[in-house]
């Protein structure tokens, strides 16, 4: 697979000098989530949707914040998370003219039930930090080698690790140098939309400013288009200012909306057990939110694309999918198709 225009062919201690990339080639991606090997028709379906890049998420596992050990099993888990799945999907993507993005995540065991999240990972003890950073380096370097092997165009070096990113900037600088010694593609980090992306100290060592774009847009029930457009205004201003100051384009490393009533107020919120089988889908708000995003943000000069969350490899018909982030089989899918195909 061919890499993008800005392959990093630089000495190991250098950083990109200007990563403002040709905006006529937007990254139009979805995160593919497949328990089993998807049918041969899956990637052609995404190409017809206008997708240019397929994003695959891999996992490392921590038992808790207090335990700095990171475990990984790249040959187990879901098909799309495995090394073999990445190899096979990248080969099919390449045959279709599609590109691949690898986006490793840490799964913090039980965090959804115990109130823990990966942005809080951090330690008062230096030895604990060193253990975590050693394990994280092993984790990321595995996927740096895999990304180089399969010709992935972009590698996301971290996702929503706010405390580490803020307190341990030198670790991330050193990790970037190490990754670039084995991987020639483009790099970004996926920073949370709140309390993180404007405070990252190593953006200039990366090719994109990566943002998990779950911005609150309106707390009103049944918001109008005007309300949602106004909701984007403050975020657009901040993103534009940061992009201009750092001379880096922005990539929305995640952007998605559920088809539920409060999607504009709490776009990050996952389906709860209480909703399953009781809440009614609101397909209109999901389609509306995507439409406003494309109208208000998509053509901004600082934006280089978005990774939409998410697309199931095998169509799930459970209520969790009906109330989840996927636009598959919902009116939002047609909104995405219209904008993605018109951008090419």
Feature names for model-found ranges:
Residues 15-48, 57:
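Boundary/entry segment of secreted carbohydrate-active catalytic domains
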Residues 33-48, 71-95, 138:
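Aromatic- and glycine-enriched glycan-recognition loops and surfaces
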Residues 34-47, 133-146, 192-202, 287-296:
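Short, acidic/polar
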Residues 52-68, 83-165, 309-314:
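Substrate-binding cleft and catalytic face of glycoside hydrolase catalytic domains
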Residues 64-76, 121-128, 223, 264-283:
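A solvent-exposed, charged loop/short amphipathic helix patch at secondary-structure junctions
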Residues 269-271, 275, 284-292, 296-344:
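Aromatic-rich peripheral "rim/lid" segments of glycoside hydrolase catalytic domains that contact
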């Amino acid at each position: 697979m061919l890499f993008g225009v800005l392959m990093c062919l630089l000495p190991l201690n250098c950083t990109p000098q200007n990563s403002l990339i040709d905006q006529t080639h937007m990254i139009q991606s979805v995160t593919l989530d497949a328990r089993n090997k998807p049918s041969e028709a899956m990637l052609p379906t995404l190409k017809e949707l206008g997708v240019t890049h397929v994003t695959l998420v891999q996992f490392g596992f921590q038992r808790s914040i207090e335990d700095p050990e990171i475990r990984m099993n790249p040959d187990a888990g879901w098909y799309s998370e495995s090394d073999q799945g990445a190899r096979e999907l990248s080969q099919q993507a390449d045959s279709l003219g599609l590109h691949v993005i690898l986006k490793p995540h840490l799964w913090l065991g039980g965090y959804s039930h115990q109130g823990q999240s990966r942005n809080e990972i951090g330690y008062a003890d230096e030895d604990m930090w060193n253990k975590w950073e050693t394990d994280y380096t092993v984790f990321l370097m595995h996927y740096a080698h895999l990304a180089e092997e399969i010709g992935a165009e972009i590698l996301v070096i971290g996702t929503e690790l706010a405390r580490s990113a803020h307190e341990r900037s030198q670790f991330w600088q050193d990790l970037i140098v190490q990754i670039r010694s084995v991987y020639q593609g483009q790099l970004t980090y996926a920073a949370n939309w709140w309390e993180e992306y404007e405070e990252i100290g190593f953006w200039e060592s990366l090719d994109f400013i990566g943002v998990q774009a779950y911005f609150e847009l309106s707390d009103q029930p049944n918001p109008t288009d005007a309300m949602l457009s106004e909701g984007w205004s403050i975020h657009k201003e901040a993103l534009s200012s940061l992009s201009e100051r750092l001379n880096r384009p922005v990539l929305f490393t995640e952007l998605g909306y559920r088809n539920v009533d409060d999607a504009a107020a709490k776009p990050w919120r996952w389906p709860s057990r209480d909703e399953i089988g009781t809440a009614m889908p609101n397909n209109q708000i999901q389609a509306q939110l995507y439409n406003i995003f494309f109208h208000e943000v998509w053509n901004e000069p600082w934006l280089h694309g978005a990774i939409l969350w998410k697309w199931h490899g095998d169509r799930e018909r459970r209520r969790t999918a009906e109330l989840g982030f996927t636009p598959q089989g919902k009116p939002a899918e047609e909104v995405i198709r219209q904008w993605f195909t018109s951008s090419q």
